[in-house]
Each structure stands twice: as C-alpha cells, then as structure tokens.
Swiss-Prot record:
2 residues (Tyr-66 and Arg-69) present in a large hydrophobic pocket are probably involved in substrate specificity. They are important for desuccinylation activity, but dispensable for deacetylation activity. Its main location: cytoplasm. This is NAD-dependent protein deacylase. Its EC number is 2.3.1.286. The lineage of its organism: Archaea, Thermoproteota, Thermoprotei, Desulfurococcales, Desulfurococcaceae. Substrate binds at residues 66, 69. It comes from Aeropyrum pernix (strain ATCC 700893 / DSM 11879 / JCM 9820 / NBRC 100138 / K1). HAMAP family: Sirtuin_ClassIII. Its cofactor is Zn(2+). Zn(2+) binds at residues 126, 129, 146, 149. The active site is at residue 118. NAD-dependent lysine deacetylase and desuccinylase that specifically removes acetyl and succinyl groups on target proteins. Modulates the activities of several proteins which are inactive in their acylated form. Deacetylates the N-terminal lysine residue of Alba, the major archaeal chromatin protein and that, in turn, increases Alba's DNA binding affinity, thereby repressing transcription. The gene is cobB.
Length: 245
C-alpha cells in the first residue's frame, strides 16, 4: 500500500515523531472495552462505576469491577502495534507515546517514555495518604486498604468528571507542538482535552498519520489516512521500514 510506504518515508526522515494511541491499539490484545458483554457488568453503565460519586456510594462494587478489569489486563499481552512503537523508540525515530489507555501495555512492550493521560488500572492510590502501589495480581479483599496507613485505596485512573493531571497534560501538549510527525492509532478523538493533541500538533506544522478502521475526528485533517486496524498497520509499516517486531 502506497500510503504505508509514504508513512515509512516520513517517519524515517522525521526529527521528532510522537505517537498518540487509544483503545483501538489494545483491542487486538483482548482488552475489554468499557461496554463489554461479559455477564454481570453488561448491566452497568461505566459512568455509574467510573466516577467519584460511585466510589463514595459503593466502593466495593466499584472495586469488583476494577478487579475484573485488572485480571484481564494482567492476562493480556502487548501486540505487534505496541511492539512497533517500542522498536521505533529504540531506533530513535519515536520520541514518546501519549496514550489514553490505562492498561500499561506500552511499557510492557518496551516503550520507555509513555505519558498515560488517564492513569493506569494496575496502580492504586490511597485516598488518605496519597501513596501508590502496583498490582501484580488482582486484589482479593475489597475494597483494598493502604498497607501504609490503612486508608481506602482507589484505582489510580482518571474518572468521569475528574480533571487530568495538569503537569502531565502540559507535557503532552508540549510534545505535540514540538513534533514534526504524529502517528494517531486507534482513537476516535472524541474525548477532550486529550483529543485536541493531534490538532495542536497539526497547527504547529506536524504531519499527521491517522490509523483507524473507521473515520474519526482527524479524518480530513490528517495528511495520511490508513483505514486499518493497529496490528495490520504495524505489520505493514515494520516490513516497509525493515523493523523486526
């Protein structure tokens, strides 16, 4: 496909390429979407679970849902698209990955500079002392308590109605404005302020490579449109660039 070869050429000649990823890059790793069809949780709207109000009302119910999600994330493995971005960073082409995902698969694939705008489901944060811990297995006693102070732990993610970390968001916009190429993979771009990052990159002169099987917010704005899934893109681009994934 000519557009893939053109993407390879643009990336090879780039000075500061950045990736921006969403749920589509992890779907092929088996990460369930918010509105999964798995038994109990199909009856719940995520907005009734992923909010501070829901946690204050019924922390055990919220943790039961997150325990289910943690179990599936721990069982998942990075796919070729995650590994492609890690290899591009290894080669010096890619400078950072900015992700809306909370599954930690970019780091597990080997990416080092990863900005997790919405947090990480494998981390918990104490509501009392603020200390953090990482899950190696799903929590058993729900809601879990802080090993330091005994306070109630909450998932270290951004819930509906909560602001993103200001310093992290500023860093992400700084990277976007500095980039000369941005690869957008697997996101509709519907959720702001994260969805504004590719537009900020474009306004600063970056070339946008938009990888998504369906039209999205960046269709018509991007310089290169690749209507394909993340893994197919990774396979094609890695061949074009001679990268082993």
């Amino acid at each position: 496909m000519e557009a893939v070869w053109e993407s390879a050429r643009i990336l090879a000649n780039s000075r500061f390429a950045v990736a921006f990823t969403g749920a589509g890059i992890s779907a092929e790793s088996g990460i369930p979407t918010f509105r999964g069809k798995d038994g109990l949780w199909s009856r719940f709207d995520p907005r009734d679970l992923a909010t501070p109000e829901a946690f204050n009302r019924d922390p055990r119910l919220v943790w039961e849902w997150y325990s289910w999600r943690i179990e599936r994330v721990l069982a998942a493995k990075p796919n070729k698209a995650h590994r492609l971005l890690a290899r591009l960073e290894d080669s010096g082409v890619l400078k950072a990955v900015i992700t809306q995902n909370v599954d930690g698969l970019h780091r597990r694939a080997g990416s080092r500079r990863v900005l997790e705008l919405h947090g990480n489901v494998l981390r918990a944060r104490c509501t009392r002392c603020g200390s953090k811990l990482e899950w190696r297995e799903k929590p058993s006693n729900l809601p879990p308590s802080c090993p330091r102070c005994g306070g109630v732990l909450r998932p270290d993610v951004v819930w509906f109605g909560e602001p993103l970390d200001t310093s992290l968001l500023e860093e992400a916009f700084g990277l976007a404005r500095r980039s000369d190429v941005m690869i957008i993979i697997g996101t509709s771009g519907a959720v702001d302020p994260a969805g504004l990052l590719p537009l900020a990159a474009k306004e600063s002169g970056a070339t946008l490579i938009n990888v998504n099987p369906e039209p999205n917010r960046y269709s018509g704005v991007a310089d290169i449109e690749l209507r394909m899934r993340a893994v197919e893109f990774a396979e094609r681009l890695s061949r074009a660039m001679g990268i082993d994934i």
